[in-house]
């Protein structure tokens, strides 16, 4: 399962709640969402493969809650690396949230299927 932006956050949530998905792709996920980091801090994902990506300019937001996105995705990736049975990957892309979403989503799914 995978998605971009809020759909990316939903895909991550699915990967924590259900064992139906072996891989999760989350391109520019809305990990700034209030409560998300507390949620993942107390759970282990059920998906065995998790791909994250974010644009390097996404944290340059005027809205303070949304500006936490880069710190949160880095913290999430650090959490995922603690699990030896979860393969995770974080890719930093050039630009903001709306730069090349189709390409970034495609790259995520290519990673998920192992090509």
What are these regions (language model features)?
Residues 14-16, 25-29, 48-62, 93-95:
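Cell-envelope and extracellular/periplasmic
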């Amino acid at each position: 399962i995978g998605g971009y932006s809020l759909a990316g956050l939903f895909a991550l949530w699915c990967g924590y709640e259900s064992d139906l998905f072996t891989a999760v792709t989350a391109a520019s996920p809305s990990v700034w969402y209030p409560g998300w980091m507390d949620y993942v801090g107390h759970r282990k994902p059920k998906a065995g493969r998790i791909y994250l990506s974010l644009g390097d300019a996404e944290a340059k937001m005027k809205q303070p809650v949304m500006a936490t996105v880069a710190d949160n995705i880095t913290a999430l990736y650090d959490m995922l690396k603690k699990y030896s049975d979860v393969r995770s990957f974080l890719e930093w892309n050039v630009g903001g949230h709306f730069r090349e979403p189709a390409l970034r989503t495609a790259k995520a799914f290519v990673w998920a299927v192992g090509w």
